[in-house]
């Protein structure tokens, strides 16, 4: 039958540490420890001195030994309880299976030898090997270790609490971040949905206006056609009659002449009447069509600005780039911070480096890119180069167009001078010659492979490893084969260059208005660097930021 824990604890209290049996005639010594009376008589003095307690090693006097009657009574009661629990009187309770005993004596390990660091039983403690050593009770020896364990345990518990706190806070932060991302997702969907609806309404509004213009033009076309057919029929009839008169014999013709009232002017019988068919496109319709074209230009500019701004702000990282002076042509002068380049017009380099442009006035950036999305700007400084002048030119052109609308319509007898046509053609040829001269003054901005060819006359096109725009007084051109004119009158002060290496695109924008100008699309396999080319006296290019 299993022994209850309280009973086993009581048995340990009434067990003699010397004989390891129940206390028989228990007595106490000076230090307070209790032993059997017969066991105390076996304790011998050490080196002729007084005997010492086997447990605490304190000396005691045998004349001070006193009986402990209460323990004797307690032993008797425990023995009776043992009988009730199915054990014979004097039989001790079994120790827990996991409790270690002395391997030599099979006794309890009550002591700890501080010299050898071993657990001892009573018999080992009294042996010659350990008698001169310092031995203390296991409970006492365990106290400092237990205290260290408890202190370390408290530290670990605090660490656990901190980790749990950090984990809880981290989970809360992650949850808050996920919640914020979800809110941002909903915001993006809602904003784009609203934007789609707005653009859809604007699209429908423009299409409705376009349909109205188409209807007006269709109706005007029918009226114009009807009036023209009627007038043509009248003239055809008169022409046919006169052709018949012209073919008459002379006598018959003169007979008809004599029958008229005015014999001197037979043609007055067929007077030349002024006709009016009307304008093919009424002035009101032309005005509305012009206003609609202006709206489309505003739409185009607005969409370019929108695309350029999103491209720059949402996808690309703005980087600071500088120029590589060793690659600069002798026609160019670089500032001390390698951010600005000026065209000198005269070759000034004393020695030609292998990586230097010789014939072409070009220069490369010192920083290259083999991945990522990066953005930088190039500013063009030159007197007379601005978008304000562009707007002024557009206004002048608009006024000229309005004047053209007022002129060019009259009656059916309006004459056209061929000399004026020849004169205008001559003016156009002169303008083309002037444009060809202006093309010589230009600059290019973009990117190039770091291995781009730098010697001799170069085309500097995508097939040569250069993706650039050319800016000139005649407008902006994509440096492709063949060269493509993009905007004849666009004059941006700053050009934004957005490079998406993995995406294989180089996008150019008006950095001030965020308008999209042009995008090159290809596959990049080499390191790319900024590229500038300047052949424009009085102009300079600056890298921003």
Curated annotation (Swiss-Prot):
Post-translational modification: Autoubiquitinates upon viral infection. In turn, autoubiquitinated TRIM26 recruits NEMO and bridges TBK1-NEMO interaction.
Catalytic activity: S-ubiquitinyl-[E2 ubiquitin-conjugating enzyme]-L-cysteine + [acceptor protein]-L-lysine = [E2 ubiquitin-conjugating enzyme]-L-cysteine + N(6)-ubiquitinyl-[acceptor protein]-L-lysine
Start and end residues of each stretch annotated as Disordered: 382-443
Pfam families tied to this protein: PRY, SPRY, zf-B_box, zf-C3HC4_4
Phenotype of the disrupted gene, per the record: TRIM26 attenuatess the production of proinflammatory cytokines in response to TLR ligands, TNF-alpha, and IL-1beta stimulation. In addition, the challenge of TRIM26-deletion mice with LPS results in inflammatory responses that are less lethal than those in wild-type mice.
CDD domains: Bbox2_TRIM10-like (cd19765), RING-HC_TRIM26_C-IV (cd16598), SPRY_PRY_TRIM15 (cd15826)
Zn-finger region bounds: B box-type: 97-138
Origin: domain of life: Eukaryota
InterPro entries, alphabetized: B30.2/SPRY, B30.2/SPRY_sf, Butyrophylin_SPRY, ConA-like_dom_sf, PRY, SPRY_dom, TRIM/RBCC, Znf_B-box
Gene Ontology, cellular component aspect: cytoplasm; nucleus
B30.2/SPRY domain boundaries: 301-545
Residues binding Zn(2+): 102, 105, 124, 130
Keywords associated with the record: Coiled coil, Cytoplasm, Immunity, Innate immunity, Metal-binding, Nucleus, Transferase, Ubl conjugation, Zinc, Zinc-finger
Chief place where the protein resides: cytoplasm
Compartments, record wording: Cytoplasm; Nucleus
Gene3D superfamilies documented for this protein: 2.60.120.920, Classic Zinc Finger (3.30.160.60), Zinc/RING finger domain, C3HC4 (zinc finger) (3.30.40.10)
GO biological process: host-mediated suppression of symbiont invasion; positive regulation of non-canonical NF-kappaB signal transduction; proteasome-mediated ubiquitin-dependent protein catabolic process; protein K11-linked ubiquitination; suppression of viral release by host
Subunit details: Interacts with TBK1; this interaction bridges together TBK1 and NEMO in order to activate TBK1. Interacts with INCA1.
Recorded family membership: Belongs to the TRIM/RBCC family.
Function comment: E3 ubiquitin-protein ligase which regulates the IFN-beta production and antiviral response downstream of various DNA-encoded pattern-recognition receptors (PRRs). Also plays a central role in determining the response to different forms of oxidative stress by controlling levels of DNA glycosylases NEIL1, NEIL3 and NTH1 that are involved in repair of damaged DNA. Promotes nuclear IRF3 ubiquitination and proteasomal degradation. Bridges together TBK1 and NEMO during the innate response to viral infection leading to the activation of TBK1.
Designated name of the protein: Tripartite motif-containing protein 26
Organism encoding this protein: Mus musculus
Gene: Trim26
């Amino acid at each position: 039958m299993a022994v209850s824990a309280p009973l086993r604890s009581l048995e340990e209290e009434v067990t003699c540490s010397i004989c390891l049996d129940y206390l028989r005639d228990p007595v106490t010594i000076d230090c307070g420890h209790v032993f059997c009376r017969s066991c105390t008589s076996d304790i011998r003095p050490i080196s002729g001195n007084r005997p010492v307690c086997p447990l605490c090693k304190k000396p005691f006097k045998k004349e001070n030994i006193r009986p402990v009657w209460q323990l004797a009574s307690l032993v008797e009661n425990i023995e009776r309880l043992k009988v009730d629990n199915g054990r014979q009187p004097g039989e001790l309770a079994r120790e827990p299976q996991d409790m270690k005993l002395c391997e030599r004596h099979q006794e309890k390990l009550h002591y700890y030898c501080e010299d050898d660091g071993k657990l001892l039983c009573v018999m080992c403690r009294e042996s010659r090997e350990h008698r001169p050593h310092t031995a203390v009770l296991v409970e006492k020896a365990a106290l400092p270790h237990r205290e260290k364990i408890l202190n370390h345990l408290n530290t670990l518990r605090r660490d656990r609490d901190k980790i749990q706190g950090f984990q809880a806070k981290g989970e809360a932060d992650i949850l808050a971040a996920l919640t914020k991302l979800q809110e941002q997702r909903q915001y993006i969907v809602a904003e784009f949905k609203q934007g789609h609806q707005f653009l859809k309404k604007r699209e429908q509004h423009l299409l409705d206006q376009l349909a109205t213009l188409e209807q007006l033009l269709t109706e005007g076309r029918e009226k114009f056609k009807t009036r023209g057919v009627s007038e043509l029929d009248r003239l055809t009839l008169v022409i046919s009659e006169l052709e018949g008169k012209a073919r008459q014999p002379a006598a018959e013709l003169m007979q008809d002449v004599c029958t008229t009232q005015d014999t001197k002017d037979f043609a007055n019988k067929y007077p030349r009447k002024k006709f009016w068919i009307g304008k093919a496109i009424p002035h009101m319709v032309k005005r509305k069509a012009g206003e609609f074209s202006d709206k489309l230009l505003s739409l185009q500019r607005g969409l370019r600005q929108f695309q350029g701004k999103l491209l720059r702000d949402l996808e690309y990282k703005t980087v600071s780039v500088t120029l590589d002076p060793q690659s600069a042509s002798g026609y160019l002068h670089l500032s001390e911070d390698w951010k600005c380049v000026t065209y000198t017009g005269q070759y000034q380099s004393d020695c030609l480096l292998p990586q230097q442009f010789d014939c072409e006035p070009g220069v490369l950036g010192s920083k290259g890119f083999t991945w990522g999305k990066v953005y930088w700007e190039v500013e063009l400084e030159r007197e007379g180069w601005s978008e304000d002048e562009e707007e002024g030119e557009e206004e002048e052109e608009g006024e000229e167009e309005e004047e053209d609308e007022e002129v060019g319509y009259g009656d059916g007898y309006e004459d056209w001078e061929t000399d004026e046509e020849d004169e205008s053609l001559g003016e156009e040829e002169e303008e083309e010659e002037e444009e060809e001269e202006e093309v010589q003054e230009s600059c290019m901005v973009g990117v190039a492979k770091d291995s781009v060819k730098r010697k001799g006359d170069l085309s500097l096109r995508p097939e040569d490893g250069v993706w650039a725009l050319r800016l000139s007084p005649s407008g902006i051109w994509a440096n492709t084969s063949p060269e493509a004119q993009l905007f004849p009158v666009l004059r941006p002060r700053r050009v934004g260059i957005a490079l998406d290496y993995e995406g294989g695109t180089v996008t150019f924008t008006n950095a001030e208005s965020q308008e999209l100008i042009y995008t090159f699309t290809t596959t990049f396999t080499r390191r790319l660097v900024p590229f500038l080319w300047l052949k424009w006296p009085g102009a300079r290019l600056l890298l921003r930021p």
